[in-house]
UniProtKB/Swiss-Prot annotation:
Top-rank taxon, per record: Bacteria
Alphabetized Pfam families for the sequence: Dala_Dala_lig_C, Dala_Dala_lig_N
NCBIfam families membership: D_ala_D_alaTIGR (TIGR01205), PRK01372.1 (NF002378)
Protein's name in the database: D-alanine--D-alanine ligase
Keywords from the UniProt entry: ATP-binding, Cell shape, Cell wall biogenesis/degradation, Cytoplasm, Ligase, Magnesium, Manganese, Metal-binding, Nucleotide-binding, Peptidoglycan synthesis
Length: 308
């Protein structure tokens, strides 16, 4: 272990993914304590800078999810405070969180993405913005918050788009729906992990399927052809590098094998702050590669830095 023994675990926050972050942060804090680190847990509020200055950590373990914690804001604050932190830096975090900007990078790198269009929420709420089926997503959210499938024959958009309670931004992305299977893969530094197939017990892999007990099954390694498996790994690492990610990231895919002789692999997004509960996807993949949960989070602390 390096001299960076006092770790501030940043969790909670005030995004739509607060509850997920609290669970991730708790798991990381417990594992780091077991590995000999002195840990202070910080439920991140708008006084986060004051909290960090008071605690004076050697490293910040960023277990925040969603806006402000995952989009470059907290990363920029930690750069200003000169506190080394885990995961990706300001630019990579901001790019990955904004689905449209991330696609610009992926296309430039020659990576496979689906056709999409970004429109005002009001426009999506009053008629089809592309031929169905398609998926409507907030431009800058994670954990499938605010994601809906619009299918052929649907006469009206999801009611949530016109709700006064909608707080997920004024623009949404409409993206061609990809039939088939849900795959995910992760990177740790320069090491590429295996591939997981996710089978949701709901219509699609939405927030409930991700976080409710029994909401989905994870098959590791994914039962797919070796060439597709290798391609998922290649694209995962290429996307990680194209965005300029550091530390750990996870790439999510759709694999359409429903048309004989015409398989299609599509990169959906890169998650720079993937879930870090002991049973989350990245810790499961790390375990497949021979790393315990504690070894994974310890590695992340030892790799923490500024100037990312």
């Amino acid at each position: 272990m390096s001299q960076a023994k006092h770790v501030a675990v940043l969790k909670g926050g005030w995004s739509a993914e607060r509850e997920v972050s609290l669970v991730s942060g708790k798991g990381c804090a417990e594992a780091l304590r077991k590995h000999g680190y002195r840990v202070t847990e910080i439920d991140a509020g708008r006084d986060l800078a004051d909290q960090i200055l008071k605690v004076k950590p050697d490293v910040a373990f960023n277990a925040l999810h969603g806006r402000w914690g995952e989009d470059g804001c907290v990363q920029g604050l930690l750069e200003i405070l000169r506190v080394p932190y885990t995961h990706s830096g300001v630019l990579a975090s901001a790019l990955a969180m904004h689905k449209e900007r991330a696609k610009f990078v992926f296309r430039a790198a020659g990576l496979p993405v689906a056709e999409s269009v970004v429109v005002p929420r009001e426009q999506a709420a009053h008629g089809h913005v592309m031929d169905p089926p398609y998926v409507i997503k907030p431009v800058s959210e994670g954990s499938s918050v605010g994601v809906f499938i619009v299918r052929a024959g649907d006469n009206r958009p999801p009611a949530e788009l016109t709700s006064a309670e909608w707080n997920l931004g004024d623009e949404v992305m409409a993206e061609r729906y990809i039939a088939g299977r849900e795959l995910t893969c992760a990177v740790m530094g320069e090491e590429i992990f295996g591939v997981t197939e996710i089978i949701a017990n709901t219509t699609f892999y939405d927030y409930e399927a991700k976080y409710q007990t029994g909401g989905s099954r994870h098959i590791i390694p994914a039962p797919i052809d070796a060439d597709i498996y290798a391609e998922v790994q290649r694209v995962t690492l290429a996307a990680h590098k194209a965005l300029g990610c550091r530390g750990v990231s996870r790439a999510d895919f759709r694999f359409d094998d429903t048309r004989p002789g015409k398989p299609e692999l599509i990169l959906l997004e890169v998650n720079t702050q993937p879930g870090m509960t002991p049973t989350s996807l990245v810790p499961e993949l790390a375990n497949l590669a021979g790393y315990s949960y504690g070894e994974l989070v310890s590695w992340m602390v030892e790799e923490a830095s500024c100037d990312r």
